[in-house]
Amino acid sequence: IARNISWETKSDTPTEFGVNIRTPKDFSEVNGYEMKYYKTDKLGLLPKAVLELKNLRNEYKVKMKESESKSEYVKWNNNQLAVKRLMASFYGIVAYQGFGWADVDLAASITASAREAIRIAAFKVREL
């Protein structure tokens, strides 16, 4: 969501939402750059869908916590877990070549931005 990664937001012009798809999978130095950029003017379809699902999941979690019976709790918990899995599957469908809208750049950008976030957090923990 943070990088606005989506089919229609891809940009050949550098923007503030750049992703280095060569971000290492470990703690080694960044060795080279291959940037993919995404437009910042309008929220893309993919992040918009994820945000809507995230809001729906949060609604289900509130209902789950407010449940007055075990069966109601289980129902809302199952609903929020289903939405969680649906959100997580978006990367898989974008990366799957059998999907009509598969896009290697989007899949690479999603995984690279996740690696970058994990690396930043890990480096901060090391500093403690």
Place the predicted regions along the sequence by residue.
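Conserved acidic
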Residues: I1-L128
